[in-house]
Regions:
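Active-site C-terminal subdomain of aminotransferase-like
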Residues: 156-160, 165, 206-294, 298-305, ...
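Active-site nucleophile and cofactor-binding loops and adjacent substrate-binding regions
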Residues: 77-84, 220-221, 256
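Catalytic PLP-binding core of fold-type I/II PLP enzymes
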Residues: 166-199
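Conserved N-terminal alpha-helix of the aminotransferase class I/II PLP-enzyme fold
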Residues: 19, 26-82, 93-96, 106-113, ...
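Conserved C-terminal alpha-helix-loop-beta "cap" of PLP-dependent enzymes
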Residues: 2-7, 98, 289-290, 294-376
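Buried hydrophobic positions in well-ordered alpha/beta secondary-structure cores of metabolic enzymes
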Residues: 68, 86, 119, 152, ...
Length: 376
């Protein structure tokens, strides 16, 4: 079985830098997303009159599941407290139904890069990595796969590639490849709501039309939306019923899930109408900074309310410039690079949210000049 390269993988997500954390707290403005999360901000997303559930049944959990199923045009949806739990269990259901243990996905997908190969260790699933790690998934890459697969996982947008999205024609070709082989098609839509504006503008396709291509759709409530935690998987009622059993087997059917579901419903209603504005601001930022020497924006053009920005600078110098801006301007830019790609190449992730909207593209241009070492 081929293994994917470990080159240029994201830095460990949870290693702490206390000094940088304290410096970030001292800043009055934050560039990324919605700014720092706090208990008070998260608790404010949970209404006091929330109807509680018991073991995931009833209350706001059921309300959220029904809304997500309708939003995505599926028969049913299930709330799961963890995306890691949700996706591997969903793929397990597809594999069991097709009596094959092989699944196909891009080598930079979350299951391969961030989950300690849980699909393999817990579910005895075998992965076929499709295509080069640094390039988007393509139908041409899929044509090189010559073994039966139970399911094809497609991530929209591809986070580790800066929020890259395929054209509608390319996406349909990838789905058709799986359909022609009797494989299920699963959408890793952790940031699906961030993909919506691109497909609406470029291809006049709605969220319903995107979801209709897939057997099962996973969406996160904390990544692009800023909720407390958790996700939903939507699909056919029989598949979701099986997934519910696996949620229990994974320990995910806890006594009460209502705080997570209530927060999810709040941010879903609050953030979805803003996604088009986030996308427009991301495009404006990318255009504004494209002329800075030593900077490259990925993808180009930007296709979602996020992007990766490559700075041609050493890691120590980059950190020093982040610290200088924080101390002199009380502006927090990047805690760390998303990937350190070489001695003088740092790739950072810029997700656009409410906090980012407070910065004009011109101001961000000035900040990036300083981070790149080409400005005062």
């Amino acid at each position: 079985m081929a293994r994917t390269s470990t080159k240029a993988r994201p830095l460990p997500a949870f290693s702490r830098d206390v000094e940088m954390e304290e410096l970030a707290k001292s800043c009055s403005r934050h560039l990324l997303g919605d700014g720092p999360r706090s208990a008070s901000k998260l608790l404010a997303t949970i209404p006091e009159d929330t109807a509680v559930d018991y073991y995931g049944i009833g209350g706001v959990v059921e309300e959220l599941e029904k809304e997500v199923a309708a939003l995505l045009g599926k028969e049913s949806a299930l709330f799961v407290p963890s995306g890691t739990m949700a996706q591997q269990a969903t793929l397990r259901v597809h594999a069991d139904r097709r009596q094959t243990r092989t699944i196909a996905f891009h080598p930079a997908c979350h299951l391969e890069s961030h989950e300690e190969r849980a699909y393999e260790r817990l579910h005895d699933l075998f992965a076929v990595p499709v295509g080069p790690r640094g390039e988007p998934l393509s139908a041409a890459n899929l044509a090189e796969v010559h073994e039966a697969v139970a399911a094809l996982l497609i991530e929209l947008p591809q986070r580790d590639l800066g929020g890259t999205l395929p054209s509608w024609k390319e996406l349909v070709a990838q789905v058709d490849w799986a359909r022609d082989r009797g494989a299920a098609v699963h959408l890793d839509g952790a940031r699906l709501f961030e993909a919506g504006p691109f497909y609406k503008k470029a291809h006049r396709k709605s969220l319903l039309e995107i979801a209709a291509l897939f057997d099962t759709v996973y969406v996160s409530f904390y990544k692009g939306l800023g909720g407390l935690a958790g996700c939903c998987v939507a699909g056919g009622a029989d598949v979701i019923d099986e997934l519910s059993i696996w949620r229990t087997r994974h320990g995910g059917r806890i006594f009460m899930l209502w705080p997570y579901a209530a927060s999810a419903l709040t941010v879903l209603h609050a953030r979805m109408p803003k996604m088009a504005g986030y996308y427009r601001h991301a495009v404006a930022i990318s255009q504004a900074v494209s002329d800075i020497p030593g900077i490259e924006v990925l993808p180009d053009p930007v296709q979602s309310p996020m992007m990766h920005v490559r700075f041609s600078v050493g890691l120590d110098d980059f950190r020093s410039r982040v610290v200088d801006i924080a101390r002199s301007d009380k502006i927090w830019t990047f805690s760390r690079p998303f990937v350190s790609e070489g001695p003088r190449l740092q790739r950072c992730e810029l997700g656009v949210g409410d906090a980012t909207l407070e910065f004009s593209p011109k101001e961000i241009h000035g900040l990036f000049e300083r981070l790149a070492g080409s400005g005062a």
